[in-house]
Swiss-Prot record:
Gene Ontology terms: cellular component: glutamyl-tRNA(Gln) amidotransferase complex
Protein name listed in UniProt: Glutamyl-tRNA(Gln) amidotransferase subunit A
Record SUPFAM superfamilies: Amidase signature (AS) enzymes
Function (record text): Allows the formation of correctly charged Gln-tRNA(Gln) through the transamidation of misacylated Glu-tRNA(Gln) in organisms which lack glutaminyl-tRNA synthetase. The reaction takes place in the presence of glutamine and ATP through an activated gamma-phospho-Glu-tRNA(Gln).
InterPro entries according to UniProt: Amidase (IPR000120), Amidase_CS (IPR020556), Amidase_dom (IPR023631), AS_sf (IPR036928), GatA (IPR004412)
Domain of life: Bacteria
EC number of this enzyme: 6.3.5.7
GO annotation, biological process: translation
Subunit structure as annotated in this protein's UniProt entry: Heterotrimer of A, B and C subunits.
Gene (name only): gatA
Reaction catalysis annotation: L-glutamyl-tRNA(Gln) + L-glutamine + ATP + H2O = L-glutaminyl-tRNA(Gln) + L-glutamate + ADP + phosphate + H(+)
Family: Belongs to the amidase family. GatA subfamily.
Source species: Pseudomonas putida (strain ATCC 47054 / DSM 6125 / CFBP 8728 / NCIMB 11950 / KT2440)
Nucleotide-binding recorded as keyword: yes
Leader sequence segment: none
Amino acid sequence: MHQLTLAEIARGLADKSFSSEELTGALLARIKQLDPQINSFISVTEDLALGQARAADARRAAGETSALLGAPIAHKDLFCTNGVRTSCGSKMLDNFKAPYDATVVAKLAEAGMVTLGKTNMDEFAMGSANESSHYGAVKNPWNLEHVPGGSSGGSAAAVAARLLPATTGTDTGGSIRQPAALTNLTGLKPTYGRVSRWGMIAYASSLDQGGPLARTAEDCALLLQGMAGFDAKDSTSIEEPVPDYSASLNASLQGLRIGLPKEYFGAGLDPRIADLVQASVKELEKLGAVVKEISLPNMQHAIPAYYVIAPAEASSNLSRFDGVRFGYRCEEPKDLTDLYKRSRGEGFGVEVQRRIMVGTYALSAGYYDAYYVKAQQIRRLIKNDFMAAFNDVDLILGPTTPNPAWKLGAKSSDPVAAYLEDVYTITANLAGLPGLSMPAGFVDGLPVGVQLLAPYFQEGRLLNVAHRYQQVTDWHTRAPNGF
């Protein structure tokens, strides 16, 4: 059963080939057997899962037919889950049990999904390798000496290892799309405001967005259907109707205009990845798409702008973790200042401390205009580039990452080298656009992804193109050895 996709599970549950309880038991056993190799879970919620599975079976027996009813899910460990540890991969929240469900968790639970656990992640979602977690690095199932990407590395590795068919992740600068690319998955970052952020512990509030990770575009469509929608509890949620994503999966690509930004194919891109991107373009042309070169001139400024804005927002968001109300508290502080300093110094890891310091500096008197305001101006220019491009094309296509997965520890001493791996993904977050990564081949036995970007709220178009591509290629069907 572990080889089944989410869509196949939905069909199997509907025709009573197996029950949710049987499926849940099989996957929990598989997690117990195989996860020690990859460390993709922080918490496994066995009792909760079996209870939810029995309830889902009862709902189905009573006549309910929802596609997600009884299907398994695991949540990135920054989605608050009532009564379950929600750690953000940090010592700071090691003992924090959320007193409520995040909207994403609640919506999927209402749809009948079964929560198998909480997945490992870079601490407070700050990282591109899933090496900064308090609970240890996650390993890439395709090669256990390599990173799975981050920050949703646990969510990606768990699906790649066939521990379950789908997971939730979050994407602040590529944290769904990049690990999806490095583990041979389909990962979708929705439009900013499409999926509620309520109960999703924030890294950078103007950039964070939750979304699905799965093996196929068909599965991402099913999961997004359950996650998306307006939420009055989230002030950044947008009241936009949610279309039937699955219904548009088989639309024709005839005449679809796809733009290839010339800036994506310069220095820094592994030429073998460039070749795989071109191969995917040829497949889409065979399906009727029309491809042309475009320009996104301000992309060159994206990384410096992002690494001012995101740390600035993080320094503000993480100021609440001070050892007073909840979270880690140091032992026997001398006074209040000592409590703050030691609780934060001992509770936060190195990468989180680095970004808090960068962000605090960027927001400080005398530097605010020089750094933060300037970064926001660049953000506007990047958004304008996309708006101009979408006057001429329907989608933008390029590599998801400049390189395949690197070895564990290879970039630990040079954080900027790791930051550069986000070069193709962060622009979508700065502009708030939807983006999708889909499997496109392998380099040295390691997976590579192709990224698609669309105008606001055109997730259906992204899923349609990815689904049609997956009907004529088999990259997404390949599984790592030993899993």
